[in-house]
């Protein structure tokens, strides 16, 4: 019992999401900063953006193209796309740290400690919370991300990105 109580103390809390609130960054602004386009732009909006953290939203619908083959009778969002969406949030966070973010891109160098805890299915709203683990140094940034459906962590990962000036 004591061990479970201690574990609960360290559990990650889900961000509070009110779909009626105006986003901090809408889909159009995301497209200005990230090179991804449909069907690979996986962040619908950003609802919180601070110096060291970001919260993004993905509304998963049954019309997502990946559900045609993953899996037709029991659609599940591929884990690799969850990590990609979280990475896109991380890219937005890092780009927010620099001047003229439209002139830069982020490329991921490393992804570690990925854990999938629950399936993501059509109808789910996924919240991505990404935090910087330290300051951006020499264009390199380390982050930790959590993905939530409701108040449950569905996946998590640590990753490192590099900021590169666009040509």
Name these PLM-found stretches.
Residues 1, 46, 111-150:
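Hydrophobic beta-sheet segments that form the core/acyl-binding groove
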Residues 1-35, 154-167:
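Segments adjacent to and within acyl-thioester-processing domains across lipid
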Residues 15-24, 90-129, 154, 161:
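Hydrophobic beta-strand-centered segment that forms part of the acyl-chain substrate-binding groove
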Residues 33, 38-77:
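Catalytic strand-loop segment that frames the active site of acyl-thioester-processing enzymes
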Residues 41, 51-55, 125-127, 142, ...:
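Intrinsic-disorder/low-complexity, polar/charged segments enriched in Ser/Thr/Lys/Arg/Asp/Glu/Gln
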Residues 46, 77-101:
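Active-site helix/loop of acyl-thioester processing domains in fatty-acid/polyketide metabolism
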Residues 48-51, 116, 159:
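Hydrophobic/anchoring residues in structured secondary elements
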Residues 60-62, 132-134, 149-151, 161-165:
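Beta-strand elements of well-folded, non-transmembrane domains
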């Amino acid at each position: 019992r004591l061990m479970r109580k201690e574990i609960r103390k360290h559990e990650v809390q889900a961000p509070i999401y009110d779909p009626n609130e105006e986003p901090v960054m809408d889909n159009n602004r995301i497209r200005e900063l990230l090179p991804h386009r449909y069907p690979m732009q996986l962040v619908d909006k950003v609802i919180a953006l601070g110096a060291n953290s970001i919260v993004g939203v993905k509304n998963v619908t049954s019309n997502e193209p990946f559900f045609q083959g993953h899996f037709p009778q029991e659609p599940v969002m591929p884990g690799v796309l969850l990590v990609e969406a979280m990475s896109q949030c991380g890219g937005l966070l890092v780009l927010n740290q620099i001047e003229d973010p439209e002139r830069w891109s982020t490329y991921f160098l490393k992804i570690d400690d990925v854990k999938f805890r629950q399936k993501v299915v059509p109808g789910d709203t996924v919240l991505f919370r990404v935090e910087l683990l330290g300051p951006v140094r020499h264009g390199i940034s380390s982050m930790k991300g959590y993905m939530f459906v409701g108040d449950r962590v569905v996946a998590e990962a640590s990753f490192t990105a590099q900021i590169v000036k666009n040509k």
